[in-house]
Amino acid sequence: MLPFEKAQPVYVGARAIGVGNAFTAIADDATACFWNPAGLIQCQGVRIFGMNKFFGRSEYGFDPKGISYSYRQTSFAWGNKIALGTRSQDPDYSYYAVARQFGSYLAFGGSLKFQRRHPSRYYQVFGYNPSFDLAVLVKLSPNWKIGLLWQNEDLRLGIDRQTIGLAYQITLKRPNSDLVVSLDLEQDHSINGKSNTKARMGFELPVSRFLQLRGGNSDGSWTTGVGLKCQFSSIIARVDYAWIGDTRTYRSHFISSEIAF
């Protein structure tokens, strides 16, 4: 079993899990801080999110959270993810991300990641074991997006993992019903120098302006999810649920919420 931070995908956000963790090219909410920081540019204004694994915590717990702020062509974000009950002694990581848009079709982003000591008697702004992510998001056409992510795990020169993501939006006849299908291909490098490739795929189908259905497969583990979105004046609230069959007992259920204003 890999240390939790090296085990991929990152499992942040019930919406991303619902589409099979194929989120590198979508990355259009505050969880982009973890999946593809370049995607933060799609989240104008302030967004706050939190997530909880509310069932099956006897196997492991996972409770990420974060906030993003975007104004015009620049975005900033902070995120934290902490796992409980794992073999790697409750790993706790903080992300600090920035993104910048260039033109109408291209954005670059990056994240600095720090491991935090847990438990701790004081707040740790940074921590230890720094590493980084580099990311690109390209809008190839009104319907196609491509996301690229390079991940480093110990701040040495070199990339330990790279991911390419594709997302395609299919316009259906019904209003508010654009189907999005996505695919992620991830390649990592093991200690013995060999490369491992993983595939993740999924879809998101808006049934109405309030309800979205999701499904996918994350490197052999099936996923499903549902989302509810409401708007109150200039405030948008969303609640998402996801299930993934990633353990022997198939009990990994997640719920997350996001507020945008």
Predicted regions: what is each one?
Residues 2-261:
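Subset of outer-membrane beta-barrel
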